[in-house]
């Protein structure tokens, strides 16, 4: 009898595991929604923008940071230059495909770094500003897909699990409007399912090329009260000269 109960329990566990598996149709739908979020955004081809950050940490005064970003999304090229504060002016990052360097204008040296690196002293990482619809299928598996509501919006709720070392977090959950594929909320988790970070995007602006998340709030869930607000401005979609995506460009700014 005991052996029978153990065997029955194992069968029930296996059955529940199979039942809990996500269907291929939901996997395909989830990836399609994630890719649609990239298509809906205005960032296609060449663009530049000013990124202003307000960093809040308990017991410290607010810190203001400002960067200029240049990106050529089709070729995975990106240059990020710090404009403020004055003491850090000229610091930057350069991306060419999977190679990423940080630049220090004082030592005039480039250091190979990771897309997981935080920008300045903020809660924003380099991969947060990367625009690429190819990154979803290449770097994630779909763990769950469902529909629900967030505030007044019906949303897709998609949980992705990292399958490469590229993503900054082991798991991320996205809340995406069903009428227009815009991400309203993102929750990032550790490998043990601990909530590490929450991103809220309360404001989008419509421009001819698509939508732009002009106001973004990033909360550090490990350090309560610590958050970064990001504001996007001065967005342009003019063709950028090739030299902007070179080490010589960063070196020539100072």
Predicted regions and their residues:
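Sec-dependent N-terminal signal peptides
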Residues: 4-14
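Sec/Tat signal peptide C-region and signal peptidase I cleavage site
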Residues: 16-20
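Flexible, processing/modification-adjacent segments and terminal tails
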Residues: 21-36, 42-45, 52, 61, ...
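Edge/loop elements at the starts and ends of beta-strands within beta-rich repeat scaffolds
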Residues: 40-46, 206-210
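N-terminal, post-signal-peptide region of Sec/Tat-exported proteins
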Residues: 45-79
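Generic short beta-strand segments
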Residues: 50-56, 83, 159-163, 218
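Mid-chain, structured segments of secreted extracytoplasmic proteins
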Residues: 65-105, 112
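Gly/Pro-enriched, hydrophobic low-complexity segments
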Residues: 111, 131, 151-247
């Amino acid at each position: 009898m005991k052996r029978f109960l153990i065997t029955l329990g194992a069968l029930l566990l296996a059955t529940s595991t199979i039942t809990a598996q996500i269907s291929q149709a939901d996997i395909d739908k989830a990836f399609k929604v994630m890719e649609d979020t990239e298509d809906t955004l205005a960032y296609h081809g060449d663009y530049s923008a000013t990124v202003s950050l307000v960093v809040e940490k308990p017991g410290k005064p607010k810190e203001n940071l400002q960067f200029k970003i240049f990106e050529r999304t089709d070729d995975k090229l990106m240059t990020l230059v710090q404009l403020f504060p004055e003491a850090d002016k000229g610091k930057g990052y350069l991306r060419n495909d999977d190679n990423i360097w940080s630049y220090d204008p004082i030592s005039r040296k480039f250091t190979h770094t990771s897309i997981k690196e935080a920008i300045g002293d903020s809660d924003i990482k380099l991969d947060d500003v990367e625009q690429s619809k190819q990154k979803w299928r290449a770097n994630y598996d779909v763990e769950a897909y469902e529909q629900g509501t967030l505030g007044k919006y019906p949303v897709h709720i998609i949980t992705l699990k990292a399958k490469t070392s590229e993503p900054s977090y082991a798991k991320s959950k996205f809340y995406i409007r069903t009428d227009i594929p815009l991400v309203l909320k993102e929750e990032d988790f550790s490998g043990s399912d601990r909530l590490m970070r929450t991103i809220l995007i309360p404001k989008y602006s419509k421009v001819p090329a698509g939508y732009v998340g002009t106001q973004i709030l990033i909360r550090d869930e490990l350090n309560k009260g610590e958050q970064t607000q990001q504001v996007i401005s001065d967005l342009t979609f003019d063709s950028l000269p090739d030299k902007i995506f070179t080490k010589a460009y960063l070196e020539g700014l100072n």
